[in-house]
Amino acid sequence: MKQQLVYTRNEAIDVKVYEPENPKAAMLLLHGISEHSGRYDYLLNFFKEHDIYCVVYDHNGHGSRDKGNRGEIGSFETLVRDAKDVYDSLPEDLPKFVIGHSMGSIVLRLLLSTIQPTGAIIVGTGNRTSPMEMIETAFVNGVAKVLPDAKSLFINRLAFSGFDRQVEGTARNRWISKNYENVVNYNKDPLSGHPVSINTFKAVNNAIFAVNSEDIIGHYSKDTHFLLISGKDDPFSHQGKDIEKLDAT
């Protein structure tokens, strides 16, 4: 693994590159909320061993890019612009793929209205359509008008503890993985599981609503191949039901 700088419209982003000797394709990976690019090292080395050139970076407010304000993404538009600029840095002569996990899947679904990759792998994506989720979204948006930068433990617990309650067991953050070792490592990792700002929750919620609009889906390339994946117990994707809904669109 090597590192390179990609100069975006916002800043110079430190991008990790996994480069095989004879790459057959290129892939950009977009990670999820309250985690960082390093969690995907094993997966990207696996792809590298199978001759796929991979790049990954930390979203704004995450990992190496917390800028002293970890958990604050700024805006979802910034996340999508960064993803577009890093995507454009992929080798031009290779088929291009993008994989987005959880919050990264929302970034990807917005990004797909502006790019035409060979393939898109959408992992654990979600919607917010239940009456309770609509109430929670309205509540968060209201609080964001007054305290956008606050990292409310109550709201963070409302979001993530609610996910935990849908999964058997007692470990904190058990909703993130069926593999107990993954959960333990996540909880030990100082760059994972951190609170995010109310503004970040608002931005994510609004983006989830936006990705289902015809303005976005109507601009997807008909030549892009899709692979939709979800854990059957994943609470963010409503136990995989949101993947089925997306497949039907």
Please provide the spans of the model-predicted regions.
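N-terminal cap/lid segment of alpha/beta-hydrolase-fold proteins
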Residues: M1-E19
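Short beta-strand element of the alpha/beta-hydrolase
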Residues: K24-G32
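Active-site glycine-rich loops that stabilize anionic/oxyanionic intermediates
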Residues: G32-E35, S102, K232-D233
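Conserved alpha/beta-hydrolase
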Residues: S37-G68
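Alpha/beta-hydrolase active-site loop
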Residues: I73-P91
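Gly/Ala-rich beta-loop-alpha elbow adjacent to hydrolase catalytic centers
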Residues: I99-G104, L108
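Alpha/beta-hydrolase-fold enzymes
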Residues: L108-L191
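Short beta-strand/loop motif that positions the catalytic acidic residue
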Residues: L228-S230
